[in-house]
Every structure is written in structure tokens, then in C-alpha cells.
Amino acid sequence: MNFDEQLANAILKKVAQVAQERHLDEEGIKDLIDTAVHAAYVDGPKVMADGMVKRLMQQIPEMVEQERTPRTAFEQRLQARWQKALDLFDSTVILTREAGERFSQKHREHVVKDKNALIEALVRIHIRACQTAAAVSVLLKSGFARDALARQRTLHELAVVAFLLKEHGTPLAERFLLHEVIETCTAAEQYESAYARLGYDPPDPANLAYARAKRDRLCQRFGKAYKNNYGWAADVIGKERPTFEDLEKAAHLNHLRPYYRMAGYGVHATAKGMYLILATSLLILTSPGVF
């Protein structure tokens, strides 16, 4: 007998006892059953849930501390094992960031005055790459190597775009920067189709109309392919719907595709990703590791 059957039998037994004591008629018994069922299946679980939540909130500090203590010890062991490599990585990130800062300070006035789209795009990519590399460092030091690889994918994507812009110059860089309008409009349209199910407020029709108008003007200027993903590179690639793999080839970085694919296993919900475990044990890890 399962829990529901046991609960139903207990309710019926109690209803029969109360009905006999109070000499209830058929209508009274029905009302009593309704009250008992509501109390058991609606009020009861709510009271239990409220109590469980209250106890859980009281236990959170202790629970988190129990998790934090071994994690801190683990990170210290990981640092001791991989300190040389981690220090080299961090020093590379620091030097790269400092070089970017010097370049930005030297050319800032030139960028603002001449509205040089190429320099602006490359500087923005450099900033994003420094932030991403810093995230890789944090993940490595915490033992999340697969997640660090996932962020390395972003570094590869940034490198591909940077190489492509450098090769083709300011006209392509301008298209790249203006493509933010296309992505904003696409996001707004997706929100418009989903806000009700999300339980959010509807978008402002005026804002959406404004975004679409900006998109349409850019498509008139650069062609209808501009509205597609990577549409800013459509003319350079020679395809209406270029893919990132097309961009890799055009940037002469497609030889790194195997690394990019391997890093993707930690990102996407594929079968391969479920089996690729960066560890020396066959145990399925739900915690960080030193490899």
C-alpha cells in the first residue's frame, strides 16, 4: 500500500468515527470528507513545507560552512600542485591587460576624434578577452577545468573575430559594431513572444518599433543578409548565412577547431559531454577536481 492509499484510508477511518459521534447525515458526511481532504492534501503540505523552509533557513549557515571548509582545503592543495602553471597564466593575463591599457591611453583621443571603428572594435574585444581570461583563472583555481575550457571557447571566438576584423579593416569593423542593433532587435522580438509565459510585463511597442526601424535601415544599407547571425561578415564570407566555422576559415584559425569542439563538450547537453570527465577516476564527479 502506497502513501496515498494509506492517507486515504486514514481519512476515511477518521471521517467514519466523527460521523458516528456527531450522527451526521449524508450531506454532513460529504462536507466532512471535503474538509478532511482539503486539510490533508492542501493545508497539510503547505504547513509542512513552511516548517521545512524555516528549518532549512536556520541550517543554511552551518550547511554552507560545512561545504566551504573542505573546499578551501581543496583549493589550497590544488594551488600547491599547479602553482607554477597558474602563476604563468596569471602573469600572461596581467601583462596582456597592461599592454591593452597602454594602447588604449595612447590612441583614445584618435579613436574618439576619427571614430575609428577598427580600433574601437579591437579594444573592446581585448577588454572582453581579458575579462574572460580572468574567469578562466578563477575556474582553474577552483578545480573546474571543464568550465575553464568552456570559457576558453569564448577566447577562441574573440580571437577569430579580431583576426578577421584586422585583415579586412574598418569597413568590416563598422558592420561588426553596428550588428549590436540586429542582436538587440532579435532579443526584443524573442521577449515579445515569451513574456506572457514568463509572467513578465509586455514590452513597450514604441521601443520595439524603434528597434525594428533601426534594423531595417541597416539592412537597407548593408543588404538583407545583415539581419542574420554573423550577417556582418556575409559579404566577406560570400554567404548569406555564414557560420562561425566559416569565420574560422576566413580568419585562418580553423586548425584550432578540434580544441574548440573539445571545449564545447562542457557547454552543450550532448551525450559526449556526459561521458567526458576530466579526472583519473571513473567516478562521476559532481565536485571540482585537480585535473
Residue ranges and their predicted role:
Residues 82, 144, 168-169:
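Short, solvent-exposed helix-helix connector turns and helix-capping sites enriched
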Residues 95-164:
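Long, hydrophobic/aromatic-enriched structural stretches that serve as scaffold segments
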Residues 161-169, 269-273:
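Extended, well-ordered alpha-helical segments in internal regulatory regions
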